[in-house]
Each structure stands twice: as structure tokens, then as C-alpha cells.
Design a protein with these regions (language model features):
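Aromatic- and glycine-enriched beta-alpha-beta binding-site module
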Residues: 124, 136, 141-142
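Active-site nucleotide-donor binding segment shared across nucleotidyl transfer reactions
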Residues: 21-54, 58, 63, 210, ...
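Conserved catalytic core of two-metal-ion nucleotidyltransferases
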Residues: 1-27, 67-127, 147-157, 161-238, ...
């Protein structure tokens, strides 16, 4: 169990989403509730009771537009975070964070942020399955490199377990690997593709673009937000019998390392030591 109460965190996260929803409506940007957040909207009319994060997705052009204009469009204290804006951030997707808070996801993650929602870009993929395997394999390879670049090489001691992280530091740079990941995702244009994907979800995240379609209004914590057009098809593909409540031991949470609702992450005095 996490050392924090779930419901207060959910309500702060919801405030971020409502700000993003307002910006997207004002500027004509497409977004959709995604993954467990969409599941919560359909099954619970809001958050899954034990869920402590929030996901949305956006077609690539809309995602890039939001990230590029977040500083001018988002009201304080919200800001965008991505690999392009933070050299310590390991993700291939972005976050919108509440900069008046501090959140450390894992003890071994060097970057600091605030409470956030995840924003996943959706990109085109090849129509033929045989042509999808290589780009996704390369994407997973470079994603693993990012992990080793950000992990303390001596996390498990100075033996063989440190060799691969140390080798990655000699052969790769964070910026270079992130540029490679972005090139892989951008190779196939979203607007021209019939099949699209959230690359971070791997090959199982490939689906028909028609599934997104024109957004479907969904109720979430008393607010009307945007879900994918064919939500039943998407949720069935991702979760199977998605209306079935999972057993307690399968109710997953993040269990964040550190959470402070009142201190801006920019003022947090990080006492952790990293050998990066």
C-alpha cells in the first residue's frame, strides 16, 4: 500500500486534466482519455478507486503543438515536461505537471517533477505486421538504453550487474538516444496511416486509427471529457473483460517514492546521491 491517501491525489490530478481539457478545446487539439483512465470513466464514471495516475493520448501533431505552446497556454502552476525540456527525464512521452508540488516516482529516478498526468503521442505504423517488428524492436532496445543511462550503475553492487549500465554511458548520450526514439516514432505519419500506436505500449499497442475517431463524450468525476470513439473495442483489446473488477492482488498502484502537495519541486532539496 502507498504511504499516501489515494483520493486527495486523484483530485489534484483531476485539476490538471481539467486545465488540459480547457486548453485543448480552446485551441482545437484532439485528445482522448486513455488506458486505465478511460477504463475508469466507463466502469466507474471516474477514477478506478485504487488508481493513482492519469493517462491521455493525442495524435502526434496535436501532442507536439501542446508541448510547444504549453508555457503560454497552460495556466500556472501547470507546465509540460518531456525529454526535450528536461535532460534527466527518461520518458518517450510527455507529462503535464503541477509545479507547485513535488513528486519523485522512484528512488533511482534522477529527475524531479510535480504531480502529473501522462500524455502519450499516437503515431502511424506500417500496415503489414512484418514491417512493424523491426521498428518496434529498435524502439524497445533504445528504451532499455535510456533505462540504463538513468539507473545508478552500482545499484546492485560493483560486480557484473554494473557493467552494462557503465557501457551504455560510454556508448550513448541521453539526448542522442531520445532523438533516435523520436525519429522511430515519427517515421510513419499519423494522418496518412490506417494503423497507429502508442509506441510506449509496444506491439500490443497497435490499433486501427478508426478506433480513435471523433471523440466520444464520457463522464469522469462529474465532468464531461473525451474518450475514444470505439471505447468498447479499445478496452476489450487492451483489458479483455474490462467490466470485471480485478482481484485485490492485481489492483496495481505506483507507490510513489516521495509526494509533497505543498512544496514546489523546483525548491525541493534533493538529498539522494546519484552516480550517473
Amino acid at each position: 500500500m502507498p504511504a499516501y491517501e489515494i483520493r486527495p491525489l486523484q483530485l489534484r490530478i483531476l485539476e490538471i486534466l481539467l486545465a488540459v481539457d480547457k486548453v485543448c478545446r480552446e485551441h482545437g487539439l484532439r485528445y482522448y482519455l486513455w488506458a486505465g483512465t478511460l477504463l475508469g470513466a466507463i466502469r466507474h464514471k471516474g477514477f478506478i478507486p485504487w488508481d493513482d495516475d492519469m493517462d491521455i493520448c493525442m495524435p502526434r501533431a496535436d501532442y507536439d503543438t501542446l508541448m510547444a505552446h504549453a508555457k503560454e497556454w497552460l495556466p500556472a502552476p501547470y507546465e509540460a515536461m518531456s525529454a526535450e525540456t528536461n535532460g534527466k527525464y527518461p520518458g518517450s512521452f510527455g507529462k503535464i505537471i503541477d509545479s507547485s508540488t513535488t513528486l519523485i516516482e522512484r528512488a533511482h529516478y534522477a529527475y524531479l517533477s510535480g504531480i502529473y498526468i501522462d500524455v502519450f503521442p499516437i503515431d502511424g505504423v506500417p500496415q503489414r505486421a512484418c514491417r512493424r517488428r523491426l521498428p518496434f524492436a529498435r524502439f524497445e532496445f533504445y528504451k532499455r538504453i535510456v533505462y540504463f543511462l538513468h539507473r545508478d550503475p552500482y545499484k546492485h553492487g560493483r560486480g557484473p550487474s554494473s557493467w552494462l549500465p557503465l557501457l551504455c554511458r560510454k556508448c550513448f548520450s541521453h539526448a542522442g538516444v531520445q532523438q533516435t526514439l523520436r525519429r522511430l516514432m515519427l517515421k510513419y505519419n499519423y494522418e496518412d496511416a490506417q494503423l497507429v500506436a502508442d509506441y510506449d505500449d509496444g506491439l500490443k499497442g497497435v490499433f486501427s486509427k478508426a478506433l480513435l475517431g471523433e471523440s466520444t463524450p464520457v463522464s469522469f468525476e462529474g465532468h464531461e471529457l473525451k474518450g475514444v470513439a470505439q471505447y468498447d473495442r479499445y478496452l476489450t483489446q487492451k483489458y479483455g473483460d474490462y467490466m470485471q473488477i480485478p482481484a485485490t492482488n492485481h489492483q496495481r498502484q505506483h507507490n510513489f517514492y516521495y509526494l509533497d502537495y505543498n512544496q514546489p519541486y523546483s525548491e525541493y532539496k534533493d538529498q539522494r546521491k546519484f552516480r550517473l
